Amino acid sequence: LINKGIPGIGICLGMQLLLEYGYEGGIKTKGLNLFEGDVKILPKFRKAKIPNIGWSDTVLSRNEEYWQKHLNNAFYYVHSYFVKLSNQEEKLATINYAEQLNINVAIYKNKLLGVQFHPEKSQRQGLELIRDYFQFHI
């Protein structure tokens, strides 16, 4: 379906599965290879707790009106891993993790959106993102 341009959203682990490889449990595992890059465990910083749980403001990487409307918000996160993209043009948004590392939290290409946060737990802005994404792309 993805190769036919049908829109989709990968949420949290779903986003991570879109990449080439992941290292959950320290074992290199193949992903769906729809985005170039891999998934790494969050680094241990003094100010950081793993898993990263709670609300964080996104920082947009693209200045497009659609993404400004839908990703320029705070969203709810529960994760221990982060996506490291090879192609930075696919990056939509980041958050600043532990005041030390900007990590990718939204990626996009060919009508496929990946988000590290949980839009279904992110109140109105998360539900609007899901609803409007499919209305816009269908």
Task: Annotate each PLM feature.
Residues 3, 37-138:
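Amide-donor transfer/coupling interface in amidating biosynthetic enzymes
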Residues 1-52:
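Cysteine-nucleophile active-site neighborhood
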